[in-house]
Amino acid sequence: MAREMTILGSAVLTLLLAGYLAQQYLPLPTPKVIGIDLGTTYCSVGVFFPGTGKVKVIPDENGHISIPSMVSFTDNDVYVGYESVELADSNPQNTIYDAKRFIGKIFTPEELEAEIGRYPFKVLNKNGMVEFSVTSNETITVSPEYVGSRLLLKLKEMAEAYLGMPVANAVISVPAEFDLKQRNSTIEAANLAGLKILRVINEPTAAAMAYGLHKADVFHVLVIDLGGGTLDVSLLNKQGGMFLTRAMSGNNKLGGQDFNQRLLQYLYKQIYQTYGFVPSRKEEIHRLRQSVEMVKLNLTLHQSAQLSALLTVEEQDRKEPHSSDTELPKDKLSSADDHRVNSGFGRGLSDKKSGESQVLFETEISRKLFDTLNEDLFQKILVPIQQVLKEGHLEKTEIDEVVLVGGSTRIPRIRQVIQEFFGKDPNTSVDPDLAVVTGVAIQAGIDGGSWPLQVSALEIPNKHLQKTNFN
């Protein structure tokens, strides 16, 4: 008996040693399942590497780790992501964005009428569902699922180029409030892109996984997701590795675009007061918007940022500079106050070829000014937070962990507003832009059987869950 036990022990040790040596010296297996964050404004793809337990968010051919959720249709081709952004000004009626807002969703006529007016492309009502009308060589209609499939195909190709092998399986995230039809429509979009979806995971749950909360000893988790166009607040209850979304609230018309718009309106007024005209050329408006975005990003790290823009003055429209209290004329507001139209890429008037001169507009924007322009919007973030606490029958002191998701949560004043409300710092240990895709990639690794083994997140369906929107 002792001899048999010795042999058995030696065999176990041999297996353990072989496993250790294999883990140390053999090439790591390539991930076979990708994780996808199909966002409203940006989307991204990541993989979980067996052995190391690391997540890699995969860049595109130009090094971007996320791509704009935009698709442009032309006579020659269909362009996706940053290539689509370049066409947004010259081809706005055929450049589709915000498709995620419409995928699998049934609208009332009143709801759809309100949505139609927000976009430069044609939004059609097909029995309460949305289709988009685009004109390339001919006028065609495309569904939100098809637009989503083009984005997913691009992400799939990025993953295949990085991994050096075909990819067929994926895990994908969706908003927690998506119903079964919206989830199935998202799966349909993935199928059109040649992907089999192994699992659909809620975005707040994915974010919590990225922060490691599926393995942590916490119970009440509040996820604040503030991106380019929307705010979503979710209250999660966690027991072991199981997550229950207990309450949701948000604002579908609050995000980084709105903060940019406040600064852009301020700049238009400054230009009018200084030079007596308002920029109307679409390429100049586009450059101004890009400059505003860069200033906003710089202000997350610095107390001030420099903005400069080369502007064309059409002499026949130029007036004497105005005093600082002069209001921008109503007829000049069309381009400056084009609120949230064309996803922040601007629209202009026809170009003129004669009687022109150029001026270099330069100004310094302080963080204090940016915060002052947006303070009322920053305070609106607290409204859905208070709502989910009310629906969850919790005091703010009972929240164990506050998790930040989305690029707009980088803004220092927003973090301060949240910190002051809860009386403690939010968890900022994960890049908020990549929190969801990181969590989805971890789940993809789990579903792909990667090692070291991770604790999977089990989501408990909540059939009574409804999202309260403050738009």
Swiss-Prot record:
State the Gene3D superfamilies in the record. Answer: 3.30.30.30, 3.30.420.40, Actin, Chain A, domain 4 (3.90.640.10)
Against Pfam families, the record matches this protein to: HSP70
What cystine linkages occur within this chain?
none
Renumbered to this chain, the signal peptide range is 1-22
Any one cellular-component term (Gene Ontology): endoplasmic reticulum
- Primary location group: other
Q: Where is this region: Disordered?
A: 314-352
Q: Which UniProt keywords apply?
A: ATP-binding, Endoplasmic reticulum, Microsome, Nucleotide-binding, Signal
Q: Compositional bias (Basic and acidic residues) spans?
A: 315-341
Question: Which compartment or compartments is the protein found in?
Answer: Microsome; Endoplasmic reticulum
Is Signal set as a keyword in this record? yes
What Gene Ontology molecular-function terms does this entry list? ATP binding; ATP-dependent protein folding chaperone
Which PANTHER family does the UniProt entry name for this protein? Answer: HEAT SHOCK PROTEIN 70KDA
Q: How does it assemble?
A: Binds UBQLN2.
Its family remark reads: Belongs to the heat shock protein 70 family.
Q: What does the UniProt record say this protein does?
A: Has peptide-independent ATPase activity.
- The protein in question is named Heat shock 70 kDa protein 13
| Gene assigned in the entry | HSPA13
